[in-house]
Amino acid sequence: MAMKAPDPGGSGEILPSTPSLSETTSGGAAAASKSAQLPSSSSDIDNIHVPSYSSWFSWTDINDCEVRSLPEFFDSRSSSKNPKFYLYLRNSIIKQYRDDHPRKISFTDVRRTLVSDVVSIRRVFDFLDSWGLINYNSSASAKPLKWEEKEAGKSAGDAASEPATTVKETAKRNCNGCKAICSIACFACDKYDLTLCARCYVRSNYRVGINSSEFKRVEISEESKPEWSDKEILLLLEAVMHYGDDWKKVASHVIGRTEKDCVSQFVKLPFGEQFVKESDSEDGLEMFDQIKDSDIPESEGIDKDGSSPNKRIKLTPLADASNPIMAQAAFLSALAGTNVAEAAARAAVRALSDVDYEADKNASRDPNRQDANAASSGETTRNESERAWADAKSLIEKEEHEVEGAIKETVEVEMKKIRDRIVHFEKLDLEMERSRKQLEEVRNLLFVDQLNIFFHTRKARKTEDRIEC
């Protein structure tokens, strides 16, 4: 909203100019009808832009929001702070700003020209600045308003005739106070287009004139978060390989994800359980590493004993394995456990030994049938190997299903505990912030009482000095 500078010789009332098309409030319509009745001023007066929500301002009257925001001038506790003195400070600051328009004024400039205590000047200056009555950026009027951004998909004619529609909530909401990402819940005010986190809402970290009852709590569901891309999963695995269980560094490596997101996604990975050091799988993983290192030629300059056990345990399955068959066998044995792998190996060796013994015995009895027995022994060996492999595979699959079920139940229980703890800590944080706010209010009241006592004592001393004189 653009307003004319006040006439020093007139009544001092703000003269609103013709509003632009972006003003849709009822105050803007009233200002337009009022400006149609008032005479047009000279063209050499600069236009001063103020926000539409500051249309309550008047040079001679005091609004209710001023009484609520600056109660020390209206509670009659101090003789030096009264409504008349407040009007003097407020109008002087606004006139000084309009005289130097479009240059912004600072608190130092105002303090040099006014005769009063620093606290009162500061309070009035911050109040006027928060409502945009001073130092309001004139270039901001050319920027699109929030309702214009919501209507960006419509044509200009539709935007002028139809009301703005609400947009879908984004998955991530940033706090307008501390600029942090709201995680579980946030507090939104549709009237002033504000979004605050729980900490800023408790601390009342919003501009003067907004009531806390105008905010509504908005739950941010976990399902609204975007799915993990392949690139983010690779970054997560890379961070876990480098930093281990230091989830702060892992979250900083995976940009745009929190520690809770990284932990939740990591336990959902199909091979996530192999990164945990379990007692029944350490031997199998070390066997896989020994087989992998033994197959690498020494000419590559790789020290087999140089790598730490932590790094060997964190290897991905079948990664850079020169012998894929042995690598797969070692990996399956690591998943199944040492007991199942040992039983399968013993059964395979026993079957091969029985086949070799029968073949040697038949060959010694009948040398003429040696070739035929060799062919049959090869076929028998293959059948026994396949049978042993099928038995071992069934045992491995059974053990794998049991392990996955146990891990899934354990992870669900732990995640439930973590969520309960997070909710509990958030409640404690809100209670602490509320207590701290009450303590600050008590301190402010104590400070005001001390100032009143000081002024009354000083006044009494002056009266006594006058009586003595």
UniProtKB/Swiss-Prot annotation:
Pfam families: Myb_DNA-binding, SWIRM, SWIRM-assoc_1. Transmembrane segments: none annotated. Expressed in roots, stems, leaves, flowers and siliques. It comes from the Eukaryota. One of its GO terms (cellular component) is SWI/SNF complex. Homodimers and heterodimers. Interacts with SWI3A, SWI3C, SWI3D, BSH, BRM and FCA (via C-terminus), and (via N-terminus) with HAB1. Interacts with MORC6 and SUVH9. This is SWI/SNF complex subunit SWI3B. The gene is SWI3B.
